[in-house]
Every structure is written in structure tokens, then in C-alpha cells.
């Protein structure tokens, strides 16, 4: 018997867990000093609102397909990010897209048929 297909997680995310006060009431956040999750990522999604700031540091390209998505290009070869070194440090001061800044948090539906979104996080980070 076949199982239901597993939903694909968004870029960077290994797992998503809903944040709740009972289990995570004592959690604290800290600034991420290691951008190792970016090392092998050559393109990152952008919003239109970010174009002015992002274009100062990155070329902006659009994905192909039925619903093109704006991307900031962080490297010319797939799997190579020229802005992040092997230790996960950003090489120079550049604009960091909102998609990266929000990680490890994300608003997500807990059920496909749900209308409301829950604040989730990647517990592997």
C-alpha cells in the first residue's frame, strides 16, 4: 500500500514545528553568526519591496515556469554561493534578503485545509 506523498519543505528548512508556549515558553533567540545553510545556495527568493536594496549587491533574476519568482543571484554556478565562505561567514557587508533573515521561523498552515497560519520554526537550527 502506498503512503501519502510528504509535503516538500521550503528552501533551507529541514523540519517545521509549531511554536507554542507550553513546549517553547523558555526558548530564546540569538543572532545567527553562522550562515552555513547558505553555503550551497546560489539563488534566494526576493520580494518586489526588496529590489532597490538587493540590486546594490546582487543581480536579480526570475525563475522560469508558469509562476516566475524573483531571485537574488548569489553565485553563477548551482551550489556555489560566492558571498559565504566555507566557515559560513558572509564575506562582506551586503543586503540580506528577508527570506534569509526570517530563518528559522516561518508562518505555515498546520493542515492543508486550514485557513489560519501558525508560527513555526525549524528545530534543527
Where are the regions that the model predicts?
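Short, extreme N-terminal leader segments that mark the start of a protein/domain
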Residues: 1-72
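Aromatic- and glycine-enriched beta-alpha-beta binding-site module
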Residues: 63-125
Amino acid at each position: 500500500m502506498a503512503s501519502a506523498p510528504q509535503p516538500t519543505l521550503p528552501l533551507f528548512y529541514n523540519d517545521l514545528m509549531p511554536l507554542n508556549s507550553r513546549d517553547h515558553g523558555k526558548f530564546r533567540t540569538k543572532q545567527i553568526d553562522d550562515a552555513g545553510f547558505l553555503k550551497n545556495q546560489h539563488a534566494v527568493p526576493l520580494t518586489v519591496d526588496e529590489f532597490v536594496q538587493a540590486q546594490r549587491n546582487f543581480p536579480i533574476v526570475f525563475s522560469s515556469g508558469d509562476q516566475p519568482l524573483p531571485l537574488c543571484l548569489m553565485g553563477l554556478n548551482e551550489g556555489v554561493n560566492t558571498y559565504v565562505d566555507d566557515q559560513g561567514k558572509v564575506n562582506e557587508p551586503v543586503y540580506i534578503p528577508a527570506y534569509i533573515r526570517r530563518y528559522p521561523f516561518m508562518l505555515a498552515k498546520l493542515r492543508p485545509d486550514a485557513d489560519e497560519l501558525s508560527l513555526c520554526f525549524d528545530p534543527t537550527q
